[in-house]
């Protein structure tokens, strides 16, 4: 497919938000859209004083989270009686801080952050109540097309990876180990380059492979500088990569608000499940004014085809266990955490039915 040219330097900048999407590390490790205001608000549908104000702090502003933006643009939150204020935190650590301090009512980030906070002894446990993405959002990009790619092809090669302990790097290393590859001995993983700059570095000739989020993966293909040969989301399995969470005290005090919020999200999920990538892209385009519709459609299609978004928001135990397997494999888990302590499916189950 012929794709529009995208400047890799520009894409490197807008990637800064997405790459922090699923890490409790500082925002410069993982991030999209520096042009997005730190605080944005729901699409302009009629609001009035009867609406309940809810502040949502998202880890990044990314096409990866399309169902959320469908819910905003189609007015589903307003329909549920919510006046939503959307804040982009640019890093899971910042999102978690906002939730713990009460600056945000709800946080949207990698669910491993709730595990870290729990292990640190948080008095008011941060509990996940809705899961949006079920795949990792990054891809392995090679210098040439490799229709018969095998993970063994990485042996002896140089790869631009991510920060140690960050979710993108942990997922990558988990896949390597699953395929019998030692991340420390069988290949060289360059962790010295900021994730927002890896696409430009790869385009400039560094390494044999690079791990990229969108829109960088599409940008490299558009410039014929790289080719997606594997999806880390597919090869790692169904991981609860990003989920909505709140303090237990907020959940207990505001069950109706959480239910309405979850209902609105479910409507966004339903729309994504019943419409084409082209239709989804048109709806969310106002959220990404700096990106042309063709590119948005290409990225939505890639995530759509790999089953990134669940049909419901129910956070299942097997996914939570896989997440802990990944953290454990990377040496980032002190001890296993009970699923029931950090997840409630009550709201998502009701919204789904």
Which residues are covered by each model-predicted region?
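Bacterial N-terminal signal peptides that target proteins for export
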Residues: 1-9
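C-terminal motif of bacterial Sec signal peptides marking the signal peptidase cleavage site
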Residues: 17-21
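Bacterial signal peptide processing site
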Residues: 23-26
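Short, glycine-/small- and polar/acidic-enriched structural segments
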Residues: 33-184, 189-192, 208-214, 230-231, ...
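Stable alpha-helical elements in mature extracytoplasmic
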Residues: 64-67, 73, 92-95, 110-113, ...
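Pocket-lining segment of extracytoplasmic ligand-binding domains
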Residues: 144, 194-288
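Secondary-structure end/capping motifs
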Residues: 252-334
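Conserved C-terminal helix/tail region of periplasmic/extracytoplasmic solute-binding proteins
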Residues: 321-353
């Amino acid at each position: 497919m012929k794709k529009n040219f995208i400047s890799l330097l520009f894409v490197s900048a807008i990637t800064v938000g997405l790459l922090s999407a699923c890490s409790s590390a500082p925002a410069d490790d993982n991030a999209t859209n520096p042009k997005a205001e730190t605080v944005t608000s729901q699409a302009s549908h009629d609001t009035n004083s009867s609406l309940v104000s809810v502040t949502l702090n998202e880890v990044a502003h990314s096409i990866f989270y399309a169902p959320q933006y469908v819910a905003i643009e189609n007015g589903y939150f307003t329909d549920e009686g919510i006046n939503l204020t959307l804040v982009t935190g640019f890093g899971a650590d910042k999102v978690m801080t906002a939730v713990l301090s009460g600056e945000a009512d709800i946080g949207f980030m990698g669910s491993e952050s709730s595990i870290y906070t729990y292990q640190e002894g948080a008095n008011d446990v941060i509990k996940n109540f809705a899961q949006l993405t079920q795949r990792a959002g990054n891809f392995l990009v090679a210098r040439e097309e490799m229709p018969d790619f095998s993970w063994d092809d990485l042996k002896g090669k140089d790869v631009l990876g991510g920060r140690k302990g960050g979710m993108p790097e942990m997922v990558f290393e988990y896949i390597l180990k699953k395929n019998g590859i030692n991340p420390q001995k069988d290949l060289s993983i360059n962790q010295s380059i900021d994730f927002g700059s890896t696409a430009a570095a790869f385009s400039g000739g560094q390494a044999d492979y690079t791990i990229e989020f969108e829109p960088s993966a599409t940008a490299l293909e558009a410039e014929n500088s790289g080719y997606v040969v594997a999806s880390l989301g597919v090869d790692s399995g169904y991981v609860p990569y990003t989920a909505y969470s709140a303090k237990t005290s907020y959940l207990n005090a505001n069950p109706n608000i959480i239910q309405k919020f979850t209902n609105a999200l479910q409507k966004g999920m339903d729309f994504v499940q019943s419409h084409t990538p082209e239709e989804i892209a048109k709806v969310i385009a106002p959220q990404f004014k700096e990106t042309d519709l063709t590119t948005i459609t290409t990225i939505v299609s890639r995530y759509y085809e790999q089953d990134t978004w669940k049909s419901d928001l129910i956070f299942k135990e097997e996914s939570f266990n896989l997440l802990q397997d990944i953290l454990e494999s990377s040496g980032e888990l002190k001890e296993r955490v009970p699923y029931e302590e950090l997840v409630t499916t009550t709201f998502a189950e009701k919204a789904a039915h």
